[in-house]
């Protein structure tokens, strides 16, 4: 199954959780924080402006992005994988390089 977001929404595959702290302590799955970064796997067609024009999104498939800890509260399971669906304005930055 393929997920196609509408308008200014994006679908993000969350990065793997960190299982160790910087000090080397191994965290159980329940104690590890969910990462606030991921890779865009699908984008919508764009935001519809008041005048009817469609503004294309500033992000594209394959971009690595950072989002807030409470962003992407819409989790969808597709082919056994949890994906986040969020509006483009919930993305804080694109990771370059």
Swiss-Prot record:
Arranged from A to Z, the UniProt key words for this protein are:
Chaperone, Cytoplasm
What GO molecular function annotations does the UniProt record carry, in alphabetical order?
A: ATP binding; metal ion binding; protein folding chaperone; protein-folding chaperone binding; unfolded protein binding
Q: Which Pfam families match?
A: Cpn10
Biological processes, Gene Ontology terms: chaperone cofactor-dependent protein refolding
Give the UniProt subcellular location, in the record's own words.
Cytoplasm
Q: What is its main location?
A: cytoplasm
User: Does this UniProt record's set of keywords contain Cytoplasm?
Assistant: yes
Output the Gene Ontology cellular-component terms: cytoplasm
Which PANTHER family does this one have?
Answer: 10 KDA HEAT SHOCK PROTEIN, CO-CHAPERONIN GROES
- What NCBIfam families does the database record attribute to this sequence? PRK00364.1-1 (NF001526), PRK00364.1-2 (NF001527), PRK00364.2-2 (NF001531), PRK00364.2-4 (NF001533)
What's its job?
Together with the chaperonin GroEL, plays an essential role in assisting protein folding. The GroEL-GroES system forms a nano-cage that allows encapsulation of the non-native substrate proteins and provides a physical environment optimized to promote and accelerate protein folding. GroES binds to the apical surface of the GroEL ring, thereby capping the opening of the GroEL channel.
Entry-linked HAMAP family: CH10 (MF_00580)
Quaternary structure (record)? Heptamer of 7 subunits arranged in a ring. Interacts with the chaperonin GroEL.
Family, per entry: Belongs to the GroES chaperonin family.
In its UniProt entry, what is this protein called?
Co-chaperonin GroES
Source organism per entry reads: Pseudomonas fluorescens (strain ATCC BAA-477 / NRRL B-23932 / Pf-5)
**Mind giving the lineage of the organism this protein is from?**
Bacteria, Pseudomonadati, Pseudomonadota, Gammaproteobacteria, Pseudomonadales
The gene name on file is groES
